[in-house]
């Protein structure tokens, strides 16, 4: 079978939304070539686990590669991808070069070549993300391993916004807590919460592909008994008091449900938000304070921030 490789040269800011656009268009896996992977600060903090080849990465910006089967609908699909990516400009997302190229690859090449980009990555004091095909031996007895299959949907869990959320969850989730994960995607934040011994974890996503992916990943990591994944729009219809609400989505979306988050949280509960670019940080902070939250902490990595607010 022949595959079409779509390469998009863009910015760090646009990686997450463009990756989601590609998955929603039916891409069988997404590869992110980011030169910052060669020098990321977290590698200095948590230790180098693998070696990367600089020749695989662009000099500037980020290259996103996605793979679509070659069929009669390919042209229409590609045009739809281009249009949806350009619509990100309406959300003030910098697309950079936004250069898109298309080439053809054989199934044999695709089936193995993309795996070279994915290796175990330690992203916090406790958590290490490990691709399903990698053999990995924990370095510490209290190390928590999350297995992910990048070919399923929505990336590997090593994007800065996800890393920040997991680091925040590690700090604030207590044994027995109730956690709601808004826009769960792969389910990685729900999985991390369950591994941190949260008693009740709910993950919601509007995309049925994400819901299925999250359910599969929770089973893969043997925490499905502690997580309920449902298709849902943000916090609509969610009931009961929660200890923690976590949301790794665009700032514009977060601003739409700060009132619901405040209402659902117990007194003293935490609202952990990420997916926020530096330029939107103050706007989100102001909205949270206006709603009644107290800003406890702001974490940052590259161009992204995570804001932890307390009710």
Curated annotation (Swiss-Prot):
A Pfam family this chain is assigned to: PrmA
Coiled coil location: none
EC number assigned by the record: 2.1.1.-
Catalytic activity: L-lysyl-[protein] + 3 S-adenosyl-L-methionine = N(6),N(6),N(6)-trimethyl-L-lysyl-[protein] + 3 S-adenosyl-L-homocysteine + 3 H(+)
InterPro entries: Ribosomal_L11_MeTrfase_PrmA, Ribosomal_PrmA_MeTrfase, SAM-dependent_MTases_sf
Keywords for this protein: Cytoplasm, Methyltransferase, S-adenosyl-L-methionine, Transferase
Domain of life: Bacteria
Membrane-spanning parts: none
One GO term of the biological process aspect: methylation
Disulphide-bridged cysteine pairs: none
Gene3D superfamilies in the cross-refs: Vaccinia Virus protein VP39
A Gene Ontology term for the protein's cellular component: cytoplasm
Annotated localization: Cytoplasm
An example molecular function term from Gene Ontology annotations: protein-lysine N-methyltransferase activity
Binding site for S-adenosyl-L-methionine: 162, 183, 205, 248
Function: Methylates ribosomal protein L11.
PANTHER family: ELECTRON TRANSFER FLAVOPROTEIN BETA SUBUNIT LYSINE METHYLTRANSFERASE
NCBIfam families tied to this protein: prmA (TIGR00406)
Recorded family membership: Belongs to the methyltransferase superfamily. PrmA family.
Protein's recorded name: Ribosomal protein L11 methyltransferase
Organism, as annotated: Bacillus licheniformis (strain ATCC 14580 / DSM 13 / JCM 2505 / CCUG 7422 / NBRC 12200 / NCIMB 9375 / NCTC 10341 / NRRL NRS-1264 / Gibson 46)
